[in-house]
Amino acid sequence: MDNNSVIGSEVDAEADESYVNAALEDGQTGKKSVQRNYATVLTEEDIRALMEIDVQSVSDFTSLSKAEATLLLSHLRWNVDCICKQWSAGAQSVRDSVGLLELDPPSDDNEYFCGACGESHPHKNLASVSCGHRICTRCWTSHINKIISEKPAAEWNLWLKCPVRVGLHASCPASVGLDTIERFASKREKFNYNQYLLRSYVDNRETMKWHPIQGSRCAIDLSPGSGNASVSCHRLVRFCWNCREDAHSPVDCKTAAKWLLENAVPCPKCKLRIPRNQDNSLKMKCLPCNYVFCWFCHVDWIEDMEGTGGDLHFCTFDAVLSDQRGKMSESDSNRYEDCYENWDSNELLMQKEQANLPKLDTIIQELSNTQLENVSQLKFILEAGLQIIECRRVLEWTYVYGYYLREDEVGKQNLLKDTQERLKKFVENLKHCLETNLQPFRYEEEPSKDFNAFRIKLTELTSLTRNHYENVVKDVENGLASVVSEGEASGSGRNQ
């Protein structure tokens, strides 16, 4: 192997610090880095505004009412371009396919019979959709309630039709639109129907997905070709766009799933993924919610122990795991322990930094008062904290990538170690500036002449760290392709 093709894994701390300082002096923070994600966080209000734009566009193009345009969009997957093309090719065909009939309006007699119950009602108590069949208020209310309460939301477009029977077994094909729902449905039913429209809009957009965290009511709109698939919402929770699990870049979904299957388990109560106990015991405790359960069968540990005399849990998985560990060679075992220790420690450090974010918000409020700065001008402090969290997350998963490298990929292993050490040094420098250099300004009673210099330094350190972090992600995602060696094949990893 050519020694010049591999960067040594032993990193001198002083050299790294000099590297960071030199980068700051040379203005490397302005260098172009890898492409970042362009993800937009959308609240329900934002989504409804986008829906309204599409509804208005279709309404203008087809000369349909907004309620009819909404019906058209919900039936045809909210694809405005496709609807316009189909409408131009044959409007009547499109109308028939979604149940928008084009018939003469009924006469305005004072009395008329309901087409559903057959009873006579004043004209003002009757209403019809595009078919013209008059239906009384009671029948509309009952019909809408039955469909929305009994049928799956995915089938509402199939069942929300005029209730009049036009034959022995056929019902009227005319669809019920939003205007009829708004007039006759209960408050709860209106809410459910509007939520259905909201969900169908997001579910039919290729670049849009709901945030997977429980309780989140926002969606993420990801611009095409925006780099790796790790995105976050306004709650600063990152997830993978492709598999909707916790963010795991720079490793792919398959590798992350394999590692998590063997080394982490979701808490049955709060769903947070918990790393495996380092002593390999089955008794797991979720610290956020204090739930105690079995690693393998997910049974509540306390309930399972009733009548057994304490922590006596018999689980066949324990024997299987011990057998698997026994089959590992000593070198494989050492590689695993080293990887798991670094993966777990970076996960814990990341969680610690996340827990520290509210403190940064408090500090920003304090500095806004003492340094006479707007809160928006102090967001560089929060950005530094968030960058540290992101670096810890990426470091965590680079160790998983390293574990699955083949044993003969020595060049990649050495380059990865060097890259990890450099990124850790960037994080340490940024963290030192954020925590140590920031502290004196918290106790100032009046604006400090040195605060602007601190702002410049922290901002540049954050930018420099971000650039290095993004290049680490890019390099690992590309399989450390910069390592060229005749002795190494181009395979993606070991034990795949």
From Swiss-Prot:
Cofactor: binding details: Binds 4 Zn(2+) ions per subunit.
EC number: 2.3.2.31
Tissue spec. comment: Preferentially expressed in roots.
Chain spans, region TRIAD supradomain: 110-319
Binding site for Zn(2+) 1: 114, 117, 136, 139
Cofactor(s) of this protein: Zn(2+)
Chemical reaction(s) catalysed: [E2 ubiquitin-conjugating enzyme]-S-ubiquitinyl-L-cysteine + [acceptor protein]-L-lysine = [E2 ubiquitin-conjugating enzyme]-L-cysteine + [acceptor protein]-N(6)-ubiquitinyl-L-lysine
Pathway(s) of this molecule: Protein modification; protein ubiquitination
Pfam families: IBR, IBR_1
Positions annotated as zinc finger (IBR-type): 191-253
Top enzyme category: transferase
Keyword terms, alphabetized: Metal-binding, Repeat, Transferase, Ubl conjugation pathway, Zinc, Zinc-finger
Residues where Zn(2+) 4 binds: 267, 270, 286, 289
Biological role: Might act as an E3 ubiquitin-protein ligase, or as part of E3 complex, which accepts ubiquitin from specific E2 ubiquitin-conjugating enzymes and then transfers it to substrates.
Family of this protein: Belongs to the RBR family. Ariadne subfamily.
Protein name per the record: Probable E3 ubiquitin-protein ligase ARI12
UniProt source species: Arabidopsis thaliana
